[in-house]
Amino acid sequence: MPGAIDDHCPAQPGEEGTAFNVTMGYKYPPLCLGHATRCIHLETQVWAAYLLERLATGKWGHLVSGLSLCPLRQMKRGVIGDTPYFQYKPVGKLCPKNFEGPSKTLIWGDCVNSHAVVLKNDSYALVIDWAPKGYLKNTCSSGGGEFLEATYFISYWEDEDHHPTLHRWFGSFFTLKWEDKDITLHPQGLV
């Protein structure tokens, strides 16, 4: 996984599932989803989810590639017209309580957990990403094309069994900016 001073985002299909920093600038093109000037190609960075990692020292922000979680054909069907979004229903296997040692194969998986999305990377261990309340908003900073303003809300809900869950994924043609006065992104990097 990226170190504390990582400043790049996934730029090759083989890097899918790599967390990258959104606060320090970029080694590769800035994160843009869809077709826009200076963006990562659609075939490489199909969509992304903004998640919050819970640390004892404070709140940190990062993005996780969704390339391995969403088939490319699903995104291609929604490229023209309304901005597509994907929502995972709170069903599926429960998150494991005990974790095996690292393996030679990189495998990402998802599972249902209270107020969290869990991405399992068997090559490096398990990473648990806690999703914040708030929303993302399109910005015009990526330039090129017609700008369509849109807001993507991330919120919790309870299912019939009163288990709070969250699974929200989305795609956008433009750069996304996190907006929540209670969330502070630290520029020092990721751990």
Curated annotation (Swiss-Prot):
The keyword Transport is assigned to this record: no
Tissue/organ expression: Cerebellum and testis.
InterPro entries: HERV-K_env (IPR029104), Retroviral_env_glycoprotein (IPR051255)
Coiled-coil intervals, chain numbering: none
Function, in words: Retroviral envelope proteins mediate receptor recognition and membrane fusion during early infection. Endogenous envelope proteins may have kept, lost or modified their original function during evolution.
Protein family per UniProt: Belongs to the beta type-B retroviral envelope protein family. HERV class-II K(HML-8) env subfamily.
Name the UniProt record assigns to this protein: Putative endogenous retrovirus group K member 11-1 Env polyprotein
Source organism: Homo sapiens (Human)
